[in-house]
């Protein structure tokens, strides 16, 4: 169990902080042992659960499941940050390039 301050509402930054705490040398042994391969099933399961929430058009369930997907994405990115291979900003940069490229092409066409 981690010691993290209780709040009425947690933020994105809190999630990032908690994931870093869990993966720290003195963090959670289970979380520290995870790899992309060992976490693959959890990642896919959360994505499928989010898709089911979409099918049900249930906003509360969507919120919960999208939070789980977000946690999985950040967890896997954090593993890569630890390995020095890429950062959250690298992923964000590529995401924005993928979004903006079709828009830019449409505007100049």
Which sequence ranges carry the predicted segments?
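Single conserved hydrophobic/aromatic residue that forms the stacking wall/gate
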Residues: 97-109
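Flexible "arm" and connector segments at domain edges
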Residues: 1-65, 71-96, 100
């Amino acid at each position: 169990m981690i010691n993290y301050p209780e709040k009425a509402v947690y933020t994105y930054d809190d999630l990032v902080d908690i994931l870093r705490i869990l993966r720290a040398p003195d963090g959670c042994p289970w979380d520290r042992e995870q790899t992309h391969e060992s976490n693959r099933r959890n990642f896919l399961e959360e994505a499928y659960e989010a898709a089911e929430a979409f099918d049900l058009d249930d906003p509360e369930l969507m919120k919960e499941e999208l939070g789980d997907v977000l946690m999985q994405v950040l967890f896997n990115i954090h593993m890569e940050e630890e390995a020095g291979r890429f950062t959250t900003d690298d992923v964000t940069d590529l995401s924005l390039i993928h979004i903006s490229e079709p828009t830019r092409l449409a505007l100049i066409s």
